[in-house]
Amino acid sequence: MTQKIKCALIGPGNIGTDLLAKLQRSPVLEPVWMVGIDPESDGLKRAREMGIKTTHEGVDGLIPHMKADGVQIVFDATSAYVHAENSRKVNAQGALMIDLTPAAIGPFCVPPVNLKEHVGKAEMNVNMVTCGGQATIPMVAAVSRVQPVAYGEIVATVSSRSAGPGTRKNIDEFTRTTAGAIEKVGGAQKGKAIIIINPADPPLIMRDTVHCLVEGEPDKEAITRSIHDMLAEVQKYVPGYKLVNGPVFDGNRVSVFLEVEGLGDYLPKYAGNLDIMTAAAARTAEMFAEEILAGKLTLQAA
């Protein structure tokens, strides 16, 4: 039996429940706690059925058990408003926080673009940007590594059913955090993000549009090659990530049209926005877990 790093999840909503399914397949991560605030929550009930310990008393219900249960990595899938306090409490117990809210108090992580940069930095909080950011920033980065991007704009369209109450409360944070990461991680000088929640029924698959204004005449061949290379990188952990059209060149504008189909772990396959977020978080946590298991990373209580 390979040793695994024990994890806890805060937030038993759409994202937390989908992430739980992914962690159970991980070779190096073992989910042991699910934390919520509603004793009747479907996510807590599902976690209990899987034999995972649960509390409906929020983070304060988890903290006393973290050391005894050996929890070293905690995922926060709640809301930007409560994340800072959650992170402070968890870090004080010497556990690493992976933030799936748009709070962004820690550095951004978009695995195919900058996961390797986080190795060896002993960070105690990393932020997974947003679902729209995880889907589109790799494409902005694919263009910006070929030539400078003066402006990057993304439009993420998600089905209404896949956007839970936490996502809806965080729309402003979504746009701000995603725009910031388009600049910091994607490499655009100026970023803008738009989210559209589509109420169509049956629900539509996640769709993303990426526009980049490059400086000078676009190097079509190099940009196209870079986009296809990046596509393959994302598909390693999100197989349903597809390039529907593009890159389309119009003057100095480069446009890419994407579709993200999920694995259907919790919500059906149209909810690719859950998948890309949870798969990226699991991938990031696995990298930290591998470092801990190899003795290269020792977590210190904050």
Swiss-Prot record:
One matching Pfam family: AcetDehyd-dimer
Catalytic activity: acetaldehyde + NAD(+) + CoA = acetyl-CoA + NADH + H(+)
GO molecular function, one term: acetaldehyde dehydrogenase (acetylating) activity
Enzyme class: oxidoreductase
Domain of life of the organism encoding this protein: Bacteria
GO process annotations (BP): catabolic process
UniProt-annotated binding residues for NAD(+): 162-170, 273
Annotated Gene3D superfamilies: Dihydrodipicolinate Reductase, domain 2 (3.30.360.10), NAD(P)-binding Rossmann-like Domain (3.40.50.720)
Active-site residues (renumbered): 131
Membership in a protein family: Belongs to the acetaldehyde dehydrogenase family.
Entry-linked HAMAP family: Ac_ald_DH_ac
Protein name (Swiss-Prot/TrEMBL): Acetaldehyde dehydrogenase
Species assigned in the record: Acidovorax sp. (strain JS42)
